Amino acid sequence: MADVMQTMRKQTVADDIPMLDILRNEAKQRGVNFSNLHGMLKSDIKSGKTRIMRSGNTLLIYDILQPGVAELHIATMDSPEKLVVAVKDLFEAMKKAGYKKGVTVTDNSQIARVLNVANIPAAVQQILGKDGKAEYQLTIQVQ
């Protein structure tokens, strides 16, 4: 467990942006109300349903679906280069915590590219979103 915590703490202290600012930025980009997002996250974390890991200015928010499987969401204010490093760190922490698979749906086609650059195996399937726009369903192998 100490290894997981050590990996999660890996970040450049001088460049740290407060977690709430990262979440505020994510809410703004997605067009959702920050107070609602923050309240939902607080409730889900308190219930044990949701957890957050951080590396640099990237947050990995994940819901535990079943043992070893999590639904993943990334919120970041890192540059693309730092995002690749953060994603590597976060998936290494998930691996050490015993996760084998992560799943997510995103409208950002660049996430698959980031995973590829970070050497994290992912199956990508393009699907039609609720608004008729393309979305990407990713199944990520953590181990």
Predicted regions and their residues:
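Conserved acetyl-CoA-binding loop-helix of GNAT-fold acetyltransferases
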Residues: 79-95
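Active-site beta-strand termini and strand-to-loop segments that position acidic
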Residues: 54-56, 64, 140-143
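Short amphipathic alpha-helix that is part of the acyltransferase structural core
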Residues: 1-36, 142
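A short helix-loop-beta-strand connector motif used in the catalytic cores of GNAT acetyltransferases and
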Residues: 39-58
